[in-house]
């Protein structure tokens, strides 16, 4: 007989939660708690009430913060290559390289923010502090684009090589603002998605399901900001002026900060667990010191605390896994330690959970590395896709379409695809796979990898046809670029969201900011690698006085060859990724 309280609870389970197994529902109903049990605290340092904090009631402020911050970021990034060529008078190759390096830096600095968040400040204060740095960088960049003394003289209708270059002082002001933004975003990127996911209690099956949906809507909010940047801001920058075009995203960055602080009373906070780098080093040192000791046949003899939670603040225990057994020696209790009870030195003896943290990082690395190729392909959206579009017919009656604004098709398809994926595709696929999320994170990422290759292949085909038409002095319509943007947009929905969720779910509790930063570092390495490949290809194909594959005048080059090179790289990567996925072992929290 089910009592009235249980009946009330069952009514609460909506369509979103129908993917829970009956066992999970029953366990939840019998062990219902009014406070979160994942180690989080509220603003007063107490266990947070499920009714008053977190969950979807806190998420609008986090999603609003992310939407406005991404609008600010993409308000700079989407058309930055045009600013380099038209305002700073750089060549196509130099401008593309500079943009890729800056974008790469924006995805490396999250390592700084992540370590600070997980070790010392926590995610909330890291986001707050780095947002201030971000805003200062935006303001400085706006001044650089607004004051005539801080930018080169206008040079319309002349090749970039013949224009006056920016002075050292002008570059100094511009790059200071640009790289302050890169530093500021380093404290936000690795923390905000994890901070949003922290609002859902991982020990509550209903909230765990909602957390999976949160990642979809988190990426949806990112693309709302991107959509506005790709349309309104790009048009303002190219038709009204760069000063106003940079001022608008600066204002939205201020709105982003305000949105974040307003939601403070509703947030759940995870305590920082200490330096993850130190814990990794402790495991390696302890394992080395006990290299000659034998592992016990019964793993229950490995050292672990008897408490419910681990010794690491804000972290649950992790179940022991096979593999990398040499690391298990860090948790072997020596004869001396057993007799003396000297268990307090983590440089000599580590818990199983601490050892499993290191194993988890090692297992993540192959997945991380195989995603670099996707980042190489994706980086073309803001660089060579834009330059390709600039060489096409962009006139509709009297209106000239800014080529960077075509990124709106990528954004639109993301905005359309996420609700379809979350509300229709997941329930449909779940019928066949039996997986609550429809697809595993790794399957989702694999589909994204394949679609990104198709996108670059579409760009290569368009470029081949465009070059043939250019020989007859016929300009191909820029609207032929739409398929490549659409394919890359669908690839984003699968790969990017899958990657964010994979690195959050698989990461140890006290390393979630760091692991989110590692996912972003993947994008950084991809941007740098893309820049390196482009520079090398441009150099070697231009030897002997040739124009090369990527000259300033693309009609004299072979950008299609470069795109096919990237397609080949992507096709080689897909089977490698599949093999890595087959061998991957998932983390299991206790």
From Swiss-Prot:
Primary location: membrane
The keyword Lipoprotein belongs to this UniProt entry's keyword annotation: no
GO molecular function terms attached to this record: transmembrane transporter activity
Classification via Pfam families: PTR2
UniProt-recorded name of the protein: Protein NRT1/ PTR FAMILY 8.5
Listed transmembrane segments: 96-116, 130-150, 168-188, 214-234, 242-262, 365-385, 401-421, 445-465, 478-498, 524-544, 562-582
Organism: Arabidopsis thaliana
Subcellular location: Membrane
Residues bearing the modification Phosphothreonine: 126
Record family assignment: Belongs to the major facilitator superfamily. Proton-dependent oligopeptide transporter (POT/PTR) (TC 2.A.17) family.
Disulfide partners: none
UniProt superkingdom: Eukaryota
Gene: NPF8.5
InterPro entries registered for this protein in UniProt: MFS_trans_sf, POT_fam, PTR2_symporter_CS
GO cellular component: plant-type vacuole membrane
Single GO BP term: oligopeptide transport
Membrane topology: Multi-pass membrane protein
Tissue and organ expression note: Expressed in shoots, roots, stems, leaves, flowers and siliques.
